């Protein structure tokens, strides 16, 4: 049955201008010898002579423009701005940097706190009068005596 039923497939064809024969569109030449010129070849520009020397090759490549550098104007305003920028950058470096992530050890933190306390420690009793100092020393002596007596009992 399949032999009797032949499928007719309609192909896209083009006719040869010399022999008027129908040739498939994909063919670039006709059996009679005629060569079909593709539209790409018609529209394409013919390449000029290829540069033979290395200098011409470098010229053929696209040139990149150089970066434009601004000239600095020597004025007091610009100097002031530069000084401000420098002072700001220095002030940021003075701050204590907090490290990100897990702390390495707790002892390092304690050492930092002790240093800060020593730096911030101010003598409160410097402006204290002699009478007040005597009253406080008597009170401290009584407190110390009571604590020592408690230790002896235990």
Swiss-Prot record:
Sites of Phosphoserine modification: 91
InterPro entries: C16orf87-like, UPF0547
Segments forming a coiled coil: 104-132
The entry's keywords: Coiled coil, Phosphoprotein
Pfam families: UPF0547
Cysteines paired by S-S bonds: none
Family per record: Belongs to the UPF0547 family.
Protein name: UPF0547 protein C16orf87 homolog
